[in-house]
């Protein structure tokens, strides 16, 4: 089968022929139709996770998948032809979703794709969406509160802005002037601040005592924490946790994406109902995925989708 792989850290992703996997007990072979790019993929390429996770080369890149069940291993309840989507969640970095087929476990990182969920949207939903759910659930914004989303134009940020706005909170999003600002406003941001300028001054002008809650998805965590009012909350996807904030009078939570079936189903239902938009900015075919990574590295708004089949 064709897959996007790297043979070593720092190598350019290329489309190569690899062996089609076979599902074992409790596993599902998914024929992938759609995927998307995430920051995790870049971290794998450049070796940023080599001390945290075991890697076995060649590594097939890609976390998000949408497609159909091709075959199942012993003890699996799904059947061939079922529409599914999710996130490849394995302890070793080797198998990924930027491939014609991927094997995943039955119990975690996979859910049924409901009617009305477009495959392209399903393929750009799992990882970033579940991370955003974790962040907003940790912050638990209330109607009338002010929530700052730092890194609002990325995949996680675009979902987080929408989820925060749905709570009735006032959302302040970071974005550059122009297209980025219009993008986050379209997602539900009430105010937009330019993170390339004096962020603290802009926040003070909007919320003099600091914001009630902040989603830290990019930039310096200490600077982000300083923008939160005393007694407020900060949730970070970048490893900033309570142990690093013992002197701060705020509650800090470190969040990792948790794409369990319930979270994936929650995201899918929100998309189908129209409560959540999948913000696909650009779409590339598998053979052009190198261009996709170049666009991702240059910075883009929303998600970069990949059509596999």
Q: Can you name each region flagged by the protein language model?
A:
Residues 2, 14, 31, 66-68, ...:
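Residues located in well-ordered beta-strands
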Residues 198-209:
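Short amphipathic alpha-helix with an adjacent loop that forms part of the alpha/beta core around
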Residues 97-99, 175-183, 241-242, 263:
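Short, glycine/polar-rich helix-capping loops at beta-to-alpha or helix-loop-helix junctions
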Residues 1, 264-309:
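C-terminal hydrophobic helical "lid"/dimerization subdomain
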Residues 54, 87-151:
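NAD(P)H dinucleotide-binding glycine-rich loop of Rossmann-like/cofactor-binding domains
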Residues 19-37, 49-90:
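Glycine-rich beta-strand-centered segment in the early N-terminal region that forms part
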Residues 80, 122-197:
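Mid-domain Rossmann-like dinucleotide-binding core that forms the NAD(H)/NADP(H) cofactor-binding site
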